[in-house]
Amino acid sequence: MESYKVMLNGPAPWGFRLQGGKDFSMPLSISRLTPGGKAAQAGVGVGDWVLYIDGESTGTMTHIEAQNRIRACGDRLCLTLSRAQNHLGKPQKDSLPCSEPPKYNFAPSTALNKTARPFGASSPPNPRPGLVTKPVTYVPLAPACTPQHNGQVSVPDPSPGAAMKTEPGLAPRTPAATPGPTSRPPWAVDPSFAERYAPDKTSTVLSKHSQPATPTPMQNRSSIVQAAQQAPESPGRTPLCYKCNKIIRGRYLVALGHYYHPEEFTCCQCRKVLDEGGFFEEKGSIFCPKCYDTRYAPSCAKCKKKITGEVMHALKMTWHVQCFTCAACKTPIRNRAFYMEEGQPYCERDYEKMFGTKCRGCDFKIDAGDRFLEALGFSWHDTCFVCAICQTNLEGKTFYSKKDKPLCKSHAFSHV
């Protein structure tokens, strides 16, 4: 790993923003640079990993610990970094199978800033194609408003039934298992990841996964969905129907390791024959997809109706996608970042328009913890309130104004 060291002379700001940390399960890295700032002039690049801060390793630091360590440096900051392009060529480990959500350790900074959890205490893995999310935690802008994670979106869709096999003398064949897809971390394959997922945002990354062709054995999960397989009678062996315990003459179904007459393999509620279209098994009972959704599907926190399509997990509750909307523009939030203000969710655009505060000098947001001042009817970072001509810092000093621009005593009557 090629690393380099930079020495920045104070005072702050240093001209960069961080993302990641131990509490995000992501390496600490540079997410944004201020054009012409101290870090940019020193050759620091967006996406570069921060290995050491003043000689102290960042491997065990949380995001807040890293920020506090930088603040404690005073007028001189020494950083050891690794170039971003070095990480792109490294082989990444395969992602987790789609039936298990990725494991992350989240340490929320406020009582409300917590990740949404999947519905139910022991929700069964979804064996069909679905979407897996990777939430990113956010540090709140101000005590009055707390951004939230919007969880995950999943799309249940029962798989079609297996093909009919009626030629005599052929044993039923099981499709070969398809290996699960592999993926690489988004910060390694997407050059724009650092900009889109800066620390002042909350969002989720969605990855499409395919279900292996062979269903997972029943003992490994409490609820499964699969298709009953039809097969002819094997020579020299007479199967018995698992339901009626009678000898099967002719075609039969193989499901859950048992044999059935085709007309006796039915949904336990609506009695629909399940030789095609797939089925669910829950605690020994067999359901068609429709009855399973009706009985076990979660309820929407807004309209209180059952959710049988896309499920939105947010604020520790489940929602229809069309029910969880921005309080201002009424647009479904889906997997985008959102912020909470007075108990109502807002999309990022409307929140910035209605509640956001920007520095008059640099036009960047004033984040929580940033030093700022109010002057000339605007908000300024403490380091951005300077003379419009000579750039002398005017914090705590006498100043003059012309066309809403601050001027020092020496340039009070200069043309702006």
Curated annotation (Swiss-Prot):
The entry's keywords: Cytoplasm, Cytoskeleton, Developmental protein, Differentiation, LIM domain, Metal-binding, Osteogenesis, Repeat, Zinc
UniProt GO molecular function: actin binding; DNA-binding transcription factor binding; metal ion binding; muscle alpha-actinin binding; transcription factor binding
Subcellular location: Cytoplasm, Cytoskeleton; Cytoplasm, Myofibril, Sarcomere, Z line
Keyword Repeat recorded: yes
PROSITE patterns, alphabetized: LIM_DOMAIN_1, LIM_DOMAIN_2, PDZ
Region feature Disordered, mapped onto this chain: 145-191, 202-221
Gene Ontology, cellular component aspect: actin cytoskeleton; actin filament; adherens junction; cortical actin cytoskeleton; cytoplasm; filamentous actin; perinuclear region of cytoplasm; stress fiber
Low complexity bias: start-end ranges: 168-181
GO biological process terms on file: actin cytoskeleton organization; cell differentiation; heart development; muscle structure development; negative regulation of DNA-binding transcription factor activity; nucleocytoplasmic transport; ossification; regulation of protein localization
LIM zinc-binding domain sequence ranges: 239-297, 298-357, 358-416
Main location: cytoplasm
Keyword Transcription appears in the UniProt entry: no
Residue stretches making up the PDZ domain: 1-85
Subunit structure: Interacts with various PKC isoforms through the LIM zinc-binding domains. Interacts with TPM2. Interacts with TBX4 and TBX5.
Annotated domain remarks: The LIM zinc-binding 2 (LIM 2) interacts with TBX4. The LIM zinc-binding 3 (LIM 3) domain provides the structural basis for recognition of tyrosine-containing tight turn structures. This domain is necessary and sufficient for interaction with TBX5.
Function statement: May function as a scaffold on which the coordinated assembly of proteins can occur. May play a role as an adapter that, via its PDZ domain, localizes LIM-binding proteins to actin filaments of both skeletal muscle and nonmuscle tissues. May be involved in bone formation.
PANTHER family for the chain: PDZ AND LIM DOMAIN PROTEIN 7 (PTHR24214:SF0), PDZ AND LIM DOMAIN PROTEIN ZASP (PTHR24214)
The protein's name in its UniProt record: PDZ and LIM domain protein 7
Organism per entry: Gallus gallus
Lineage per the UniProt record: Eukaryota, Metazoa, Chordata, Craniata, Vertebrata
Gene: PDLIM7
